[in-house]
Swiss-Prot record:
Record-given protein name: Death domain-containing protein CRADD
Domain (CARD): residue spans on this chain: 1-91
Assembly and oligomerization: Forms a complex named the PIDDosome with PIDD1 and CASP2. Interacts (via Death domain) with RIPK1 (via Death domain); the interaction is direct. Interacts with TRADD. Interacts with TNFRSF1A.
Species the sequence originates in: Pongo abelii
GO cellular component, one term: endopeptidase complex
């Protein structure tokens, strides 16, 4: 999920909690679309109040990949006023992006291109243990991470390279420098790492 969308959920957290969004079809829709796992749904339903259920859902959503926010909007069919409020807050966040959210000095054709194997290798050299939350925010799963670790048990850099190559294969044209930049910011890793990849 993009940093901007996470910020919107954070800002509207209490308002969303007051709406008790989990009482309708929201959870089922998010489960059906693959945003929530069966365990997530059980964990949310185990909460004792509607407010707690909604708060837990809001805690889980940011780590559920790039489509989580839009799918969450789609799930709010029964709450059109909430959906409009979220869309409006998102538009305001877009027009109000701080300078750090833009990659200065990088041409748009590069931002919209996918990183090469060599560039992924450079990123892997610079990323520390935070590589796991980064690839999760880009839409990979814990299972993907487990497989990368199992394939390269003694070489962390190879684990990281394989994870980013999986991301590039899975998301195709959407696996761009721009989405990588958003993923780094989402987990508060310095996005200037990308500039080193482009040197």
């Amino acid at each position: 999920m993009e940093a901007r969308d996470k910020q919107v959920l954070r800002l509207l957290r209490l308002e969303l909690g007051a709406e008790v969004l989990v009482e309708g079809l929201v959870l089922q829709y998010l489960y059906q679309e693959g945003i929530l796992t069966e365990n997530h749904v059980q964990e949310i339903n185990a909460q004792t109040t509607g407010l707690r259920k909604t708060m837990l859902l809001l805690d889980i959503l940011p780590s559920r990949g790039p489509k989580a926010f839009d799918t969450f909007l789609d799930s709010l069919q029964e709450f059109p006023w909430v959906r409009e409020k979220l869309k409006k807050a998102r538009e305001e966040a877009m027009t109000d992006l701080p300078a750090g959210d833009r990659l200065t000095g990088i041409p748009s054709h590069i931002l919209n291109s996918s990183p090469s194997d060599r560039q992924i290798n450079q990123l892997a050299q610079r990323l520390g243990p935070e590589w796991e939350p980064v690839v999760l925010s880009l839409g990979l799963s814990q299972t993907d991470i487990y497989r990368c670790k199992a394939n390269h048990p003694h070489n962390v850099q190879s684990q990281v390279v394989e994870a980013f190559i999986r991301w590039r294969q899975r998301f195709g044209k959407q696996a761009t420098f721009q989405s990588l930049h958003n993923g780094l910011r989402a987990v508060e890793v310095d996005p200037s790492l990308l500039l080193h990849m482009l040197e």
